[in-house]
């Protein structure tokens, strides 16, 4: 289900058709300024000004996470209201794997879909446990994710233990 920036339900094709889409998957408990900055910083990376104007920043909340299943319905409406209050369109999915979300969005958005992630989310992409049901495991999942214009924008973070800034080149992956 997709909600427009005013909180009203919309067809995904209407708001995403032939537009670059920047997707941030979070729980949004609560919506933080860094969430909005992550999307804004990723959008600024577009070369053409006309592409930046056409780009859609999209919050994605999955209800497929079994660990969060107990409280997902109790506060989902509050999170949707908070995202609408900051003017962020929202996609609510039951797709646990990002490659499934990418496939869904590629039906509507062109020329590209960009997933925006912090360093912890980036490292989680390489965790093999969620992909045990795929014959190719994590490699198959990554291959299915990064296809036909789907990319990842990594937002730097600070290591809580050392204070060092973590980037794609310095983050530890499993």
Give the residues covered by each predicted segment:
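Nucleotidyltransferase catalytic core that binds NTPs
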Residues: 1-174
């Amino acid at each position: 289900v997709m909600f427009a920036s005013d909180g009203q339900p919309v067809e995904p094709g209407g708001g995403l058709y032939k537009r670059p889409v920047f997707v941030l998957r979070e729980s949004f408990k609560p919506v933080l300024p860094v969430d909005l900055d992550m999307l804004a910083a990723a959008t600024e990376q577009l070369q053409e000004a006309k592409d930046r104007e056409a780009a859609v920043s999209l919050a994605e909340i999955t209800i497929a996470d079994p660990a969060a299943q107990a409280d997902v319905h109790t506060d989902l409406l509050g999170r949707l209201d908070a995202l609408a209050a900051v003017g962020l369109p929202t996609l609510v999915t039951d797709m646990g794997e990002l490659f499934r979300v990418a496939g869904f969005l590629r039906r509507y958005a062109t020329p590209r879909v960009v997933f925006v992630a912090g360093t912890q989310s980036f490292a989680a992409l390489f965790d093999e446990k969620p992909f045990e049901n795929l014959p190719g495991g994590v490699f198959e999942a990554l291959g299915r994710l990064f296809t036909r214009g789907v990319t990842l924008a990594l937002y730097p973070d600070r290591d809580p233990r050392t204070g060092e800034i973590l980037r794609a080149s310095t983050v530890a992956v499993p």
